[in-house]
């Protein structure tokens, strides 16, 4: 096989070629994350989309402040990072107003979810790495999960039922500019699973 031939003849090549061979082996062993690149991908299942892979072409997240009021009237807040991931180029010019533009073809799919931060935070607080559970009471919670698809010239927006939503989002990396993680949530016959990397939008 070519791979074996390359190894057998590696010492007959010059030094740069040997370096390339070593790098190729490292990638094959998964030690350098060479296969990850900048991409990510989701697997969705719903009555509208069927079961399909959704390679993520663009993804954005933006923060708002969510307010909670308990039975005594006491108010608390938390950051809510609304996240969109799609297999087409999203328009992030004006946050939700443009991210939510109608799809233009039947093969386009957009996934949406919100990540609620810790108690006492607001839209200025950075998102923390950690687990956001669908079953959390209020904070460190994933909610408002939906899938947008298109058929017959019209968008079909399906929200996963909050009462039966299970699973979690694990944010593995979070900075001021970008968040990365894995999502695995379901409700009834609708589910979303996979990885994402979202650029954080900031208000001027």
Q: Which role does the model predict for each range below?
A:
Residues 1-15:
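N-terminal secretory signal peptides that target proteins for export/translocation
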Residues 17-22:
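Sec-dependent signal peptide recognition
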Residues 30-33:
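C-terminal motif of bacterial Sec signal peptides marking the signal peptidase cleavage site
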Residues 35-159:
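An ectodomain-focused feature that recognizes extracytoplasmic/extracellular
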Residues 125-203:
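Acidic, glycine-rich flexible loop segments
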């Amino acid at each position: 096989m070519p791979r074996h031939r390359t190894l057998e003849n590696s010492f007959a090549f010059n030094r740069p070629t040997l370096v390339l061979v070593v790098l190729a082996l490292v990638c094959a062993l998964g030690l350098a994350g060479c296969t990850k690149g900048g991409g990510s991908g989701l697997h969705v299942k719903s009555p509208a989309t069927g079961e399909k892979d959704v390679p993520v072409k663009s993804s954005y997240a933006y923060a708002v402040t969510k307010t909670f009021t308990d039975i005594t009237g006491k108010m608390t807040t938390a950051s809510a990072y609304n996240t969109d991931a799609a297999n087409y180029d999203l328009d992030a010019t004006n946050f939700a107003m443009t991210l939510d533009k109608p799809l233009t073809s039947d093969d386009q799919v957009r996934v949406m979810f919100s990540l609620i931060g810790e108690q006492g935070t607001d839209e200025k607080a950075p998102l923390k790495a950690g687990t956001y559970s669908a079953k959390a009471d209020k904070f460190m919670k994933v909610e408002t999960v939906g899938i947008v698809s298109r058929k017959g010239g019209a968008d079909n927006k399906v929200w996963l039922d909050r009462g039966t939503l299970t699973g979690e989002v694990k944010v593995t990396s979070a900075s001021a500019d970008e968040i990365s993680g894995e999502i695995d949530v379901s409700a009834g016959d609708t589910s979303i699973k996979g990885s994402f990397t979202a650029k954080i939008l900031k208000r001027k």
